[in-house]
Amino acid sequence: MIVPIELAHTKNITYDITIDALPQLTFDTKVAVVTNPTVAGYHLQTLLAHIKAPQLEVITVPDGEEYKTLETVETILNELFEHKFDRKSLLIAFGGGVIGDMTGFTASLYQRGIDFIQIPTTLLSQVDASVGGKTGVNNRYGKNLIGAFYQPKAVYIDPAFLKTLPSREFSAGVAEIIKMAVMFDKDYFEFLVTADLSDEEVLKETIRRSVELKAWVVNQDEKEAGIRAVLNYGHTFGHVVENETGYTTYLHGEAVAIGMVMANALAVELGLLGETEADRIKALLEKASLPTHYTIKDVDDFYEHFFLDKKSANNSIKFILPEGIGGHKIVSDIDESVVKNVLKKFEEEV
């Protein structure tokens, strides 16, 4: 199954997202696989058996969001220099969203840009992070504040890699699936309410529908000038949760789930979402074993973090909110007191 990326406003950038068993990959240039010890332990030998290249290197970096930094990117760059990679060389991102983001960003920097491909191994990266060309790293001010839009040459999604994924990581990926359904497709939401994702065929169908939705958005708006910003539902709040907890307490998808609950509370306050709809979304998140509670220690500090969000501009915060299930609205003129009153509801767990 192939989902095409054909960027509407960018000349000559097209590539395929292949959802199937990993094919044999043959290259006529130097190739470096960037991965982490966890993925390497389970799947590296399988990947290497599928690659033919005149020179093949493996670069292993530490596992975890806390290592998604400029320092780690510099480590990868130095390895490429050590192995005398050139502008025709290729990187392969083999791992989850952290590996994909850092590998893509490294590819954008090395000698002003070399090719890379994505082979995602987590549900979150298969349905979301590997699709669309967002790359980057975190710093002490916030998440993904340093980065670039840099498209891969191809994406290969093999659901078989998910068989070794811990249940918590799997749930984190489901958060991004629910996000897309709430924003764009009520029928898909209803499908997810009853879907058994432990069934391989149901899971493959879920991956397909999610990738098609993401590709549909990216094809219209590569650089988040419009509709692509809607994919940040849950992220404005979720990124603050991640930052406040040092990127070590919650997986990204878990923080997004909490952020969705917070965004829903604001949407209910503004009359965009009914209480019953908010409860249904929360129930679906809980069905996926995702956290839906977070205690805000200081509402003022939490609010100030919003201004470090990439979507904020001219001292205005853009909130991505559901307008019913299957609809969305971007709102940037909400009075500070309204937002803070909603945040106060999370000073004690709801």
Curated annotation (Swiss-Prot):
Keyword Transport among record annotations: no
Residues bound to NAD(+): 63-68, 97-101, 121-122, 134, 143, 161-164
Pathways per UniProt: Metabolic intermediate biosynthesis; chorismate biosynthesis; chorismate from D-erythrose 4-phosphate and phosphoenolpyruvate: step 2/7
Binding sites annotated in the UniProt record for Zn(2+): E176, H235, H252
Biological process annotations from GO: amino acid biosynthetic process; aromatic amino acid family biosynthetic process; chorismate biosynthetic process
Coiled-coil annotated spans: none
Subcellular localization(s) per the UniProt record: Cytoplasm
Entry's cofactor comment: Binds 1 divalent metal cation per subunit. Can use either Co(2+) or Zn(2+).
Catalytic EC class: lyase
UniProt keyword Lipid biosynthesis present: no
Keyword line: Amino-acid biosynthesis, Aromatic amino acid biosynthesis, Cobalt, Cytoplasm, Lyase, Metal-binding, NAD, Nucleotide-binding, Zinc
Protein task: Catalyzes the conversion of 3-deoxy-D-arabino-heptulosonate 7-phosphate (DAHP) to dehydroquinate (DHQ).
NCBIfam families noted in UniProt: aroB
Protein name in UniProt: 3-dehydroquinate synthase
Organism: Sulfurovum sp. (strain NBC37-1)
Gene: aroB
